[in-house]
C-alpha cells in the first residue's frame, strides 16, 4: 500500500494552492499520510489535513512527546539514541529516518534553504522511493526518482547547503547500518 511522507521546511508556514491540490489528490485516493510534528510545513500540513477531516494520518515524533498534533491523530514516538538528550538536528532527524523507511513515496515542501528537507529527499532516494519536491520560492514541483534526478536537484542548492548536507549525510551513515549509496553526494 502506498504511504506518503509529507514534510518540509520549518520556514514554510502556509500551503500554496498548488500544494493543497496535491494533498487533495492524496486525500481523494485515501492514501495514508506520515507527517512530522515540527512547526512550519509539518504543522501547516497537519492543519490542512484537519480542515479536510482526513483520518488516515500518523504523526511521528522524536522522543517521548509530540510538539504538534493538530488533528488528534495516532502518534508514533520514535525512540532516540541514549545519547540523544539534546534536542538538536540529530534528535529530530530520528523521526524523519523512520518516516522515510516506512513511506513508499514522499512530498517535500522546500524553501531552498532547509538542510532537513534535502536530507529527507536523500533518505527517500537512497531507498529507491520517488519524491516530489515543491520548491516554494519558484512555485514549482520537481520529481526526484533516480540518482541523475538527485544530482540535478542538488545542483539547485547553494554550495554551503551542499556542504551541510554532505556533512549530515556522513554523520548519519556512520550512525546507521551502512548505506551503499554514499556516491549520491
Predicted regions span which residues?
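Glycine-rich beta-strand-to-loop/alpha-helix junction loops that act as flexible
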Residues: 7-9
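Acidic/glycine-enriched connector segments
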Residues: 11-177
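Extreme N-terminal starter segment of soluble prokaryotic enzymes
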Residues: 1-4
Amino acid at each position: 500500500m502506498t504511504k506518503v511522507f509529507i514534510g518540509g521546511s520549518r520556514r514554510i508556514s502556509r500551503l500554496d494552492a498548488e500544494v493543497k491540490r496535491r494533498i487533495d489528490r492524496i486525500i481523494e485516493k485515501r492514501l495514508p499520510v506520515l507527517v512530522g510534528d515540527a512547526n512550519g510545513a509539518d504543522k501547516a500540513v497537519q492543519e490542512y489535513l484537519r480542515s479536510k477531516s482526513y483520518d488516515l494520518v500518523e504523526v511521528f515524533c522524536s522522543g517521548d512527546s509530540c510538539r504538534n498534533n493538530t488533528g488528534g491523530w495516532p502518534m508514533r514516538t520514535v525512540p532516540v539514541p541514549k545519547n540523544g538528550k539534546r534536542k538538536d538536528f540529530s534528535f529530530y532527524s530520528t523521526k524523519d529516518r523512520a518516516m522515510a523507511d516506512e513511506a513508499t513515496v514522499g512530498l517535500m515542501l522546500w524553501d531552498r534553504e532547509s538542510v532537513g528537507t534535502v536530507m529527507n529527499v536523500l533518505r527517500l532516494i537512497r531507498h529507491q522511493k520517488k519524491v516530489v519536491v515543491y520548491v516554494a520560492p519558484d512555485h514549482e514541483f520537481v520529481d526526484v526518482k533516480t540518482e541523475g534526478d538527485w544530482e540535478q536537484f542538488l545542483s539547485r542548492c547553494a554550495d554551503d547547503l551542499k556542504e551541510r548536507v554532505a556533512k549530515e549525510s556522513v554523520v548519519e551513515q556512520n550512525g546507521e547500518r551502512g548505506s551503499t549509496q554514499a556516491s549520491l553526494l
